[in-house]
Structure formats: structure tokens, C-alpha cells
Amino acid sequence: MAPRIPSIPSSTDLSGQSALVTGSNTGIGFENARQFLQLKASPVYLAVRSVERGQEAKKLLLDDPEVKKKNPGAVVEIYQVDMASFDSVAAFAQKFSEVKKLNIAVLNAGVSFFKYIPTSDGYETVLQVNYLSNALLATHLLPLLKAGAAASGKPSHLAFVSSNMQHMTSLKKNTIKPNENIIDWFNNRANFGMDRYNVSKLLLTGFTNELASKIDSSQVVINSMCPGLVATNFDTNSPWYLKYLMKGVRSLMARTPSEGARALTLAAITGTEGNGKYYSDGKETPSAALLLTEDGKAFQKKLWDQTLERIQQLDPTSPPPI
């Protein structure tokens, strides 16, 4: 059995705070939104690919007995975004900016594929959805989060859903040559591997580390976390033999979506001591060993610089994060 994720402190009260959760019409994103509502957050924004499914999720959330009891005036709003399209992310960001301020953002949307599938933007899907689009969206959300902090007098929170799979990649010290662009290297079909999901979470954690080191934690607390193995349909795109294997593993070890979502909620309510941290099982833990070495830190810095440059190329309206 997986270690138990700590309970959310009973004193937690998110009254007057707004929260955004991406990928929130199902699974741990849905349960994370439910937990925010039960903690009295409002409005809670669901950023989803399908508005119809988002509306179904909204009804389920507002019909939840505990939400009705603890947060009877709760507001849930639906926004459409497809993380496999940079234009969609930019359009969502522009529309969402109308809220003016935000207190909590949990970037949960992600995918897993075991074959190279390009998006309409010409990027490998897992690289784009799990990494580049999350980085792009984060730059758009930071001004809103800073405004939320200024209005509330306490730090806002930006939490990225990562994974312990970042510890298991084929990436080594000299895998990518100094003169090679990291994003282009991973976007090259010849460099695609079965560990692409793992790599995407390594990149996301590296970006999170750099971002957290550059933003004042009294304004925005930034961190990442792993919810662990959760009983969801996340492996829909896996080969049949992996689905069969994971079905057995999940029956023995998987957390419920509600339990997994607690990891997201806990990361999103930490104090400033949680800035730049990586959490697993609801507890602070080291990120991938590669990122902790001097070479890894240099890789992380290079990734940061090249990601910001690429984001500006993809979406010139993206505000500089620092």
C-alpha cells in the first residue's frame, strides 16, 4: 500500500479565496476542485478541454452535500482550454485575465503517450501538454496571482502537478550536447522514448524550481508535487499490456482520486516555507537526482532560458515572469 497522505489541517479555511484547477472535470483535478470548495474557496474555476464535461462536473460539485453545507454560496465557473494548442492556451489566458486576481492555481492537466504524436503546432504532444503549455500558462497567471496576493495581504499559490517518474529517465549528463537546444532535442522524433512522460515531469520540475527561485514568495508560493499512483483512467493511451499490468498494480496500491487530490491541495496551501519545494506523499522530498547536481542545475538554468525564449516566440502576448 502507498504511504498515507496527511490530512488537510482542520483549521484550513479558504473563505474569500479563488482557485483555478486545470484538467478538473474528472480524476484528481475534479477532487482537488471539490476539496477547495469544501474548504470554502469561491469562485473555483474549472479549466477543461470539454465545456460539456465541465458543466457536468460543475453540477456534481455544487450538488456535493459537504459543499452545500460548508460553502452554500459557492460559485463554480467553466473555462475551455486545450493544452495541446498554444493558441487555445493564449485565448484562455486572455479571457481568464478578466477575473483580475487569483489566489490559487493548480496546473494539473497532463497526458501520457508511448508513441510520437505531433500536435497541430508541430510539437510532440506530451512535451507540449505536460511542459510547454504549463510553462506558458504559468507566465499568464502570475500577474493575476500577484494581484490576488496584494488584495488579500497573503501569498497566492501556484502548484504544478509533477510525478516521481521524473526519477526514472534515460537522460544523462551528456545526453544533450551544449550546443543543442533542449526543447528542439526533445521535440525531435529520433529522441522520443518510452520515458517521455517521465522526462516531461523532469522538465516541469526543473522549470518550477527556477521560477520559484525568481519570484518573491511573499507574493506567490510556487512548488510542485506528485499525487502518487491514483485509480483513474490516466493510462487510457497506454499499450494494452501496460493497461493490463497497471490494472493489477492499481488494485493493490493505488490511491483513490480523493486521496491523490489531497497532495495537490496540501501543496497549494503551504506557507512560504513551501516555496520551491517538491512534495511526494504530501511531504517534502528531493526532486530528481539529476537536478540536484551542478551539471543538473546548469541544465535547469539552460532549460529556463530556452523555455522563456520559446514561450515568447509561441505567444508574444505572454508577460515576462520576472
Curated annotation (Swiss-Prot):
It is an enzyme of class 1 (oxidoreductase). Keywords: NAD, NADP, Oxidoreductase. Pfam families: adh_short. The active site is at Y197. Pathway: Secondary metabolite biosynthesis; terpenoid biosynthesis. NAD(+) binds at A47, V48, I104, A105, V106, Y197, N198, V199, S200, K201, V230, A231, T232. GO terms for biological process: terpenoid biosynthetic process. Disruption phenotype: Abolishes the production of arthrobotrisins A to D and arthrosporol A, and leads to the accumulation of 11 new sesquiterpenyl epoxy-cyclohexenoids (SECs) and derivatives with diverse oxidation patterns. Shows substantial reduction in conidiation. Develops far more adhesive trapping devices and traps and increases the number of captured nematodes by the traps. Shows significantly increased ammonia levels in fungal mycelia. Induction: Expression is down-regulated by the cluster-specific transcription factor AOL_s00215g275. Expression is also down-regulated by the HOG1-MAPK pathway downstream transcription factor MSN2. One of its GO terms (molecular function) is oxidoreductase activity. Its EC number is 1.1.1.-. InterPro entries: NAD(P)-bd_dom_sf, SDR_fam. Belongs to the short-chain dehydrogenases/reductases (SDR) family. Short chain dehydrogenase; part of the gene cluster that mediates the biosynthesis of sesquiterpenyl epoxy-cyclohexenoids (SECs) such as anthrobotrisins and arthrosporols, metabolites that possess a novel hybrid carbon skeleton consisting of a polyketide-derived epoxycyclohexenol combined with a terpenoid-derived monocyclic sesquiterpenol substructure (PKS-PTS hybrid). The SEC pathway plays an important role for fungal soil colonization via decreasing fungal nematode-capturing ability. This is Short chain dehydrogenase AOL_s00215g274. It comes from Arthrobotrys oligospora (strain ATCC 24927 / CBS 115.81 / DSM 1491).
